[in-house]
Regions:
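Transmembrane helical elements of multi-pass membrane transporters/channels
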Residues: 29-33, 37, 41, 59-121
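Hydrophobic/aromatic residues within the transmembrane alpha-helices of Major Facilitator Superfamily
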Residues: 2, 35, 77-81, 110, ...
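Alpha-helical transmembrane segments of compact multi-pass small-molecule transporters, enriched
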Residues: 3-4, 170, 226-227
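Small-residue-rich hydrophobic transmembrane alpha-helices
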Residues: 100-164, 197-219
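Membrane-helix interface segments
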Residues: 18-19, 96-97, 213-215, 241-242
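Alpha-helical transmembrane segments of multipass membrane proteins
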Residues: 5-13, 38, 84, 88, ...
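Short alpha-helical transmembrane segments in multi-pass integral membrane proteins
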Residues: 10, 14-70, 126-193, 235-273
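Helix-terminus/linker motif at the lipid-water interface of multi-pass membrane proteins
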Residues: 7-17, 77-106, 110, 128, ...
Length: 273
């Protein structure tokens, strides 16, 4: 994304050092990305420009937007709360595990970012056809999107599994062998199940598009709830340890996938999509 590119530029120049520099780079990158989007939209999408006659209050639209945004806020809050709880557990295993987790999560997020954005585009496609009543196109689009997401996720899984060590070396010095080993274990466990999160992103997008955002919240709670509960349970076993945290993440994805697909079959029958 443009935000991440700008952040890398600001960080590479290192105008402000340390944590303050990273924080400043993040804020500046977000501002640059927002400004770029505004300029692009104004120049290339005249239909989205504001005009005086558009400045009116619509109570129905406000109510609809508020209902959707509230559920989205709940979804994001649950997601971040779960991540914080897992991060707290990871921190209890010491600095080496903390450093490995921090580096591996960045690689992990970058690896599945394309399928996440694909899920957003998929949501737009479904919403347009749902509004137009084109359920036949929705059905074909769902099949095509799932195949595409699975194939892409499998490809990325292979790349991350094979190149786990070189990827860790982007963030870690070669002599920090413990951090590299822990990070590689994380990447290879998560990477083997990228299909799970790829499908989950499609399910999030699908339920938002057909005006069932509450289902996206349910899937998020299932995924993150499973991750948190299993993380604390498995990590408490001496024979499992920190590896249990890594395994809890894809297990959460897969459980949410099963529930989401089961509900999709029901919704498909009811709505004809």
């Amino acid at each position: 994304r443009s935000e991440y590119s700008a952040r890398l530029v600001f960080l590479s120049y290192n105008w402000i050092g340390g944590i303050q520099g990273a924080a400043a780079a993040t804020v500046l990158a977000q501002g640059v990305a927002a400004l770029g989007i505004i300029i692009y939209t104004y120049r290339r999408r005249p239909e989205l420009r504001w005009h005086h006659e558009d400045m009116c209050f619509d109570r129905t639209c406000l109510k609809e937007i508020a209902s959707f945004s509230t559920l989205t806020c709940i979804q994001q809050s649950v997601m971040n709360l779960g991540i914080l709880m897992v991060q707290g557990l990871v921190n209890s295993f010491g600095t080496a595990v903390m450093a490995a987790f921090a580096a591996a999560v960045k690689i992990d997020s970058f690896a599945y970012m394309p399928v996440q954005e694909f899920g957003n585009a998929f949501s737009t496609f479904i919403a347009q056809n749902f509004g137009a009543g084109r359920y036949d196109r929705i059905h074909r689009g769902v099949r095509s999107a799932f195949v595409t997401a699975v194939v892409f996720s499998l490809l990325v899984s292979v790349l991350v599994f094979v190149f786990a060590e070189p990827l860790m070396l982007i963030f870690v010095r070669p002599d920090e062998t413990e951090i590299i080993a822990v990070g590689m274990a994380y990447l290879r466990i998560e990477g083997a199940f990228y299909c799970g999160i790829g499908i989950l992103f499609l399910l999030y997008g699908y339920y938002r598009a057909i005006r069932m955002p509450g289902m996206s919240v349910v899937l998020t709670v299932l995924s993150l709830g499973t991750r948190v509960v299993l993380s604390y349970w498995l990590a408490s076993m001496p024979e499992v340890g920190v590896t249990g945290i890594w395994w809890s993440i894809p297990i959460g994805w897969l459980i949410a996938d099963v529930v989401g697909i089961w509900c999709y079959r029901y919704v498909k029958g009811v709505r004809g999509s």
